[in-house]
Amino acid sequence: MDVNPTLLFLKVPVQNAISTTFPYTGDPPYSHGTGTGYTMDTVNRTHQYSEKGKWTTNTETGAPQLNPIDGPLPEDNEPSGYAQTDCVLEAMAFLEESHPGIFENSCLETMEIVQQTRVDKLTQGRQTYDWTLNRNQPAATALANTIEIFRSNGLTANESGRLIDFLKDVMESMDKEEMEITTHFQRKRRVRDNMTKKMVTQRTIGKKKQRLNKKSYLIRALTLNTMTKDAERGKLKRRAIATPGMQIRGFVYFVETLARSICEKLEQSGLPVGGNEKKAKLANVVRKMMTNSQDTELSFTITGDNTKWNENQNPRMFLAMITYITRNQPEWFRNVLSIAPIMFSNKMARLGKGYMFESKSMKLRTQIPAEMLANIDLKYFNELTKKKIDKIRPLLIDGTASLSPGMMMGMFNMLSTVLGVSILNLGQKRCTKTTYWWDGLQSSDDFALIVNAPNHEGIQAGVDRFYRTCKLVGINMSKKKSYINRTGTFEFTSFFYRYGFVANFSMELPSFGVSGINESADMSIGVTVIKNNMINNDLGPATAQMALQLFIKDYRYTYRCHRGDTQIQTRRSFELKKLWEQTRSKAGLLVSDGGPNLYNIRNLHIPEVCLKWELMDEDYQGRLCNPLNPFVSHKEIESVNNAVVMPAHGPAKSMEYDAVATTHSWIPKRNRSILNTSQRGILEDEQMYQKCCNLFEKFFPSSSYRRPVGISSMVEAMVSRARIDARIDFESGRIKKEEFAEIMKICSTIEELRRQK
């Protein structure tokens, strides 16, 4: 029987059909090669938008800088970055007037956080530009390197462990005439292999001391490294994103803390909340506009898009905002917060790896590093690249480009949201003093604008007024990419609104399936994704049940763990059949051991091991959950783990899932090839760092774990803790006298060794 597909939708309200419009199957595009071209595009575009500004030269670094602030008022619709200081301050003042005490309270909250934040806050985050090695590193390693070099240069305020004290060191480091750093380098030499008698290249890693003068150090401290943004769908061209170094990160963190605190108090802000909470907050604004548009009034909504948001924002404007927001606060606080925008006004963009050339005829490949672009002959490049390099040359110093205007992606999301909301806030009737008025939603560069007016002319006038007001603060609404609709239907941050936010379940499709971490985590993540979608995305019970069955099937094929009584032959089936036959209670076997699936949509919240524990044979329990099982590189797992899931649109989301440590929670071994490269030294540092932290947490289990306060070192803290624990255990009879004596002896030996060192 043929089914007419339109029949499927007869009973479905049209907004529910959105999941059928899903365009993103298959893998998203990833970038290969260097990001140098994309970074040059960003730098050149940013300068083009501000070209009528004033040029100055930075006295410390010699970098040419363009300042578009208070530049000419725009005469056309081209995007421009000429924000007017007095307009921004006016918008800030009005924001405060309509939300009494908002800045004051946020400053107090932030001040408290500033005084309590530990320097290890900076270990969060992924790749960070490491100024000591002049390339990207994991955040923890980059921080450790920075602190190590600060200390060897006599900057020791950071030893208190407070972030604010580390930032004092950063400030002092910028005044020093020179900084001595340790860098890694590698030597290659050809040697004969004893076994095979062939010639092989042997690499050795060395560390060498290097002195940076004030200018070179400042350039590195102000550098943002650039990479290409990966996995971006729906774009023909890739684009560059920035990773700042450790000197900038701490200051940015405090500014964003203040801005976040303000955003939380603004009903039009889509940050910092997410998910259902965000939907509820936004639905409120829409409801307000719809109830206030009386029968006589029209209400329209613009699904907005801004042209090159980051490249038209300006750090100098952010400095003005912060100066205003903190105007009644203590001097030290104002200084700390004003440093981030000042550093961004003087930032340098590192151009990345440079260009790769290959000659097909001679089979030669050579890399032109970014440092050489300043004076290489341009005849080797194509026309497009020639233009780029020509344009950027006046800005180059040591392979980095001076980039004073613009913000680079993802740096001040919260603060730029405050600026956006302050313009939405100017739409109140008492401010427009006309028949039209507006309100809306803002989340970083994304916005939705709701305009109410008695007639269509009024709506048009309101939109025009909003457009021009935005221009005055460097926000450029794109007339081509924004569209207007009767209020009740619009899109904002990939949420589609039609008489309420519509669940777009298809967006979550890419996160269904087997993640490929290990058997234990994958099972847990798989069922958690289904559970979360039932809660948040209108995934109905029948569909969920089907998703679950498909997931189990997928899982069994991935790990070749078909049921023990199946006919399917795989590499594992022989062992699994044997296990099946000798198991009394077959229902107790995990799916990954060839057992049956006991999940249904009612028990998705229970980890599989717990679900089947009572059904397991005793010896199976003993093998499965035995930390002493020698065949398992066993990893201790907190009761909750975090997985990264990829929705179709927007950033990768972190998702919590329950983790029960079993013999299936293995971790794959690291690739050996890294051990022969220049990364090896770093890898060893990282492992050392990891081991120390793990050891420390052994002594301070999370329940009693308070960060060590004061100046006692990690070792001293652990020794004193060991002594206290030993005494308690001895007095309660948990350990014998000999064991107690031995522990005390070890503690004394450690202290003795420290004194000698």
From Swiss-Prot:
Signal peptide: none annotated. GO terms for cellular component: host cell cytoplasm; host cell nucleus. It is an enzyme of class 2 (transferase). GO terms for biological process: DNA-templated transcription; symbiont-mediated suppression of host gene expression; symbiont-mediated suppression of host mRNA transcription via inhibition of RNA polymerase II activity; viral RNA genome replication; viral transcription. GO terms for molecular function: nucleotide binding; RNA binding; RNA-directed RNA polymerase activity. Gene3D superfamilies: 6.10.140.720. A motif (Nuclear localization signal) lies at residues 187-195, 203-216. Residues 286-483 form the RdRp catalytic domain. Its main location: host cell. Residues 249-256 are annotated as: Promoter-binding site. It is found in: Host nucleus; Host cytoplasm. It comes from the Viruses. RNA-dependent RNA polymerase which is responsible for replication and transcription of virus RNA segments. The transcription of viral mRNAs occurs by a unique mechanism called cap-snatching. 5' methylated caps of cellular mRNAs are cleaved after 10-13 nucleotides by PA. In turn, these short capped RNAs are used as primers by PB1 for transcription of viral mRNAs. During virus replication, PB1 initiates RNA synthesis and copy vRNA into complementary RNA (cRNA) which in turn serves as a template for the production of more vRNAs. Belongs to the influenza viruses polymerase PB1 family. Influenza RNA polymerase is composed of three subunits: PB1, PB2 and PA. Interacts (via N-terminus) with PA (via C-terminus). Interacts (via C-terminus) with PB2 (via N-terminus); this interaction is essential for transcription initiation. This is RNA-directed RNA polymerase catalytic subunit.
